[in-house]
């Protein structure tokens, strides 16, 4: 991710967002390569990222927990793109059980703790984003 940010900085004059995939273990969150999030965020900042965040692997409720930690690690805008729950196989295909309504509630929580942008990753559909937008207009 650091090399990608540095390259984008060199070759384009647009804002650069870098999101990473995290997993949770008993010691907390780490990238899928085992890297500490605070160190990784500092490296992305030093490389010139304008926006940092997390995507994929974890469901929206876990993303809220991770985002709280990330908010304490950086002043940069944060982008979060959680999965629609954890997948399970049904007839050989992944199925995500989280509803757009539950996902949107977690998205509102993400915004309330200082996340600047929320999207969706695996298992989400346009309906998930529509539900977030609908709930945002109610607040």
Would you name each region that the model predicts?
Residues 1-139:
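Domain-level signal for soluble alpha/beta catalytic cores
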């Amino acid at each position: 991710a650091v090399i990608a940010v540095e390259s984008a900085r060199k070759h384009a004059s647009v804002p650069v967002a870098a999101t990473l995939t995290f997993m949770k273990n008993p010691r907390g969150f780490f990238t899928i390569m085992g890297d500490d999030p605070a160190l990784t965020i500092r490296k992305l900042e030093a490389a010139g990222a304008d926006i940092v965040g997390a995507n994929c692997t974890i469901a929206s409720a876990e993303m809220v927990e991770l985002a709280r930690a990330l908010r304490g690690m950086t002043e940069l805008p944060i982008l979060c793109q959680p999965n629609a729950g954890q997948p399970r196989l049904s007839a050989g295909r992944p199925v995500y059980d989280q509803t757009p309504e539950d996902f949107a509630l977690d998205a509102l929580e993400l915004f309330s703790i200082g996340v600047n942008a929320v999207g969706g990753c695996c298992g989400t559909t346009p309906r998930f984003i529509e539900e977030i937008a609908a709930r945002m207009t109610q607040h």
